[in-house]
Amino acid sequence: MIRPQTFKAILVFVANDISGGEDDRTPGEVLKLYRILVRQIRVRNPDTPVFWIETTPTPSRWHATGRIRTANRKIRRYCDRNPDLYFIGTHEAFTGPEGTPDSTLFRSDMLHLNRDGYRLWAELIKQSLSEEGILP
């Protein structure tokens, strides 16, 4: 899965496991898949920090936000309890004062980020990597 290389960090972003469809995974299944991924990463990269980027709230999947937030909470707890696992929060940055997704950060499909959305997303990632000493 991951070739023998030295990484400063590994970033993981998953957004399609819970989309509001019939075939959605449960929050528990999403956590289980992440734990499997981490075990696979650890085989060749035992000390490399792994950063989970929170599944970003989107207007088009807002109807599934309860399950998405539950999965995010489970993964945050897992990261908090394990060394070299980090959780990059995005929810607060992508929601407005009413607590719903800020539609100005998304393309017309209200699922994918636009330029401003990606700029904000990149800032959150860079900030976390800097806080952990990965980036200057």
Predicted regions mapped to residue ranges:
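Alpha-helical cap/lid subdomain in secreted, periplasmic
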Residues: 1-136
